A protein has these predicted regions:
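Extreme N-terminal segment that seeds HTH/winged-HTH DNA-binding domains in transcriptional regulators
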Residues: 1-29
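Key DNA-contact positions within bacterial/archaeal DNA-binding proteins
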Residues: 35
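HTH-adjacent hinge/linker in prokaryotic transcriptional regulators
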Residues: 42-61
Length: 61
């Protein structure tokens, strides 16, 4: 899975979840490190996506 596919998958996972998802949980689902997910979330947010960070994880408001 390349970076663009991974970011799409992150968006889909967050949209489908009814609770916040941690970077660790997203990393396990995408087969990458937690730090890669943190970077991807930062890029998605910089691109205008409304992703909220909570103490329990990331969520789409």
């Amino acid at each position: 899975m390349n970076a663009a596919e991974r970011r799409t998958k992150i968006t889909e996972l967050l949209a489908a979840s009814d609770r916040p998802m941690s970077a660790t949980a997203l990393a396990a689902r995408c087969g990458v490190s937690r730090q890669i997910i943190v970077g991807d979330i930062a890029l998605l947010r910089a691109g205008g996506m409304d992703i909220a960070a909570t103490p329990r994880g990331y969520v789409l408001p």
